[in-house]
Amino acid sequence: MQLRKALLVIFVAYLLVTDEAEAFWGFLGKLAMKAVPSLIGGNKSSSKRKREIEDLFDPYQKDLDLQRLDRFFSQFQ
């Protein structure tokens, strides 16, 4: 167990001193930025709203639901 801790300390110290550390920490940062919103669950509502806006302003949509349009714009008042 102590050997693992020692190797982990050596590895982290190596990353802090070398140029490869930038790529490693960048990868960990990107991974954390993707994981945190998915754990919280805030990303689902954002994608749902984005999809609703895309559907609302679809130029090929023939039947435009005016009640849905009024509901959408009432959110901004």
UniProtKB/Swiss-Prot annotation:
A Gene Ontology cellular-component term: extracellular region
Gene Ontology process terms (BP): defense response to bacterium; defense response to fungus; killing of cells of another organism
Main localization, broad class: secreted
Top-level taxon: Eukaryota
Signal sequence region: 1-23
Subcellular location field: Secreted; Target cell membrane
Propeptide segments, given as residue ranges: 49-77
Tissue-by-tissue expression: Expressed by the venom gland.
UniProt keywords, alphabetically: Antibiotic, Antimicrobial, Cleavage on pair of basic residues, Cytolysis, Fungicide, Membrane, Secreted, Signal, Target cell membrane, Target membrane
Job of this protein: Antimicrobial peptide with potent activity against Gram-positive bacteria S.aureus (MIC=10 uM) and S.agalactiaea (MIC=15 uM), and Gram-negative bacteria E.coli (MIC=24 uM) and P.aeruginosa (MIC=15 uM), as well as against yeasts Candida albicans (MIC=3.1 uM) and C.glabrata (MIC=25 uM). Also elicits low hemolysis on human erythrocytes (HC(50)=167 uM).
Family under the similarity heading: Belongs to the non-disulfide-bridged peptide (NDBP) superfamily. Medium-length antimicrobial peptide (group 3) family.
Name listed for the protein in its UniProt record: VpAmp2.0
Species annotation: Mesomexovis punctatus
